[in-house]
Amino acid sequence: MSQEILEKVCSIVSEQLSVEAAEVKSDSNFQNDLGADSLDTVELVMALEEAFDIEIPDEAAEGIATVGDAVKFIEEKKG
């Protein structure tokens, strides 16, 4: 897992969900651990798309439940 991408995703998640950066780990679940609701999740996906200049299709977004899932998806898209 790319440390650079992980740090950037953690920063975005912390900002979008208004949680302390120290609470955001690679295995943190957006809804169960970080308190995100469905709207938060949509906004988070949009922020990740913008930050990494990628497109995350709805089907893929549904499979992204943790910070690690997001990092893995971004790594695959960025090649």
UniProtKB/Swiss-Prot annotation:
Cellular component, GO, one term: cytosol
MF GO annotations: acyl binding; acyl carrier activity
Carrier domain segment(s): 3-78
Stored InterPro entries: ACP (IPR003231), ACP-like_sf (IPR036736), PP-bd_ACP (IPR009081), Ppantetheine_attach_site (IPR006162)
Keyword Lipid biosynthesis attached: yes
Pathway, per record: Lipid metabolism; fatty acid biosynthesis
Similarity remark: Belongs to the acyl carrier protein (ACP) family.
Protein name: Acyl carrier protein
Lineage per the UniProt record: Bacteria, Bacillati, Cyanobacteriota, Cyanophyceae, Synechococcales
